[in-house]
Amino acid sequence: MILQVLEFNYLGVSSHAMSYQLRQAEIPILPAGHAPIRVLHFSDLHLTPARKTEIADIKSFIDLSPDLVISTGDFLAHMQAVPVALDALDALLDLPGLFVFGSNDYYAPKPKNPLKYLLPDHGKRIHGEDLPWPDLDKGLQSRGWINLNRSRATIKIKDTTIETRGTDDAHLEFDDYSLVAGKPGPCDIAIGVTHAPYLRILEGMAKDGLDAIFAGHTHGGQVRLPLPGGSRALTTNCDLPTWRARGLTKFGSEPYLHVSAGMGTSPFARIRVASPPEVSLVTLTSAPQY
């Protein structure tokens, strides 16, 4: 079975700050009788102190009343962005949260042609100075969020025990799935969290029997081809097929994959074509009983 949720019919081009769109999806993986769990999934904020629109949007996320928050990385895009990010997320940090980092949490962005992502990836990474990611890590963990970059953890949300695991950024080849590999322990469901959805990560998590995977990185393709009734990603900036560039998809018996198209862009390439900024509200529900 191949599943892909309907995408937004957005064919605009923008090079300035835009308010986000809300993507909603449902994943039927909970045991029968368990209460639904509202998961707020966001990614790729690429925050700078100047991004007032995005900061205000992030502060409004609490109004979606999530039970669990998952961030799949790239919080930062500026040396002074850590206090900005922690302030924007302040209300959400009172909720259970899981996070991993992306390349832009480690290194400042540098000017480059955004259309280069349409070319074959030769593995060469261009990045700027080191960013103060340890301060971000400390700030998030001090409020109770769990760093899944190289770890597993078990949490309980409502009446559901969730085993979680994650990897560091595969785009920088910082990932090492062997550190968290193995079948889930006692739990109701098992989920994976990673920034860049490279197939080696997805395949490892699928082999271990996870129920769902959350990722970001792709920006939904960032520059999509407008088509009647929707649009098509031209790239994912990794080896994930373009039809899975954003939203909820499922292939065969593999775990559900939810890829956030993200909120931001590099400060040097503030353009998104037919791929508006978005945040997702993913509701985990009980599987249908037949």
Give residue ranges: language-model regions.
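Active-site neighborhood of phospho(di)ester-bond hydrolases with catalytic His/Asp-centered motifs
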Residues: 41-43, 68-74, 97-103, 148-150, ...
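Short, conserved loop/helix-junction motifs that constitute active-site signature segments
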Residues: 64, 89-94, 182-186, 205-208
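N-terminal active-site segment of His-dependent metallophosphoesterases
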Residues: 2-88, 108
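Binuclear metal-dependent hydrolase catalytic cores centered on His/Asp/Glu-rich metal-binding motifs
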Residues: 112-145, 151-152, 157-203, 269-272
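Core catalytic region of metal-dependent phosphoesterases/phosphodiesterases
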Residues: 52-156
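Acidic/histidine-rich helix-loop elements
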Residues: 14, 36-55, 76-78, 107-128, ...
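Conserved beta-sheet core of the metallophosphoesterase superfamily
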Residues: 98, 197-280
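Beta-strand-turn-beta hairpins that frame and shape the catalytic cleft
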Residues: 20, 26-40, 145-146, 152-164, ...
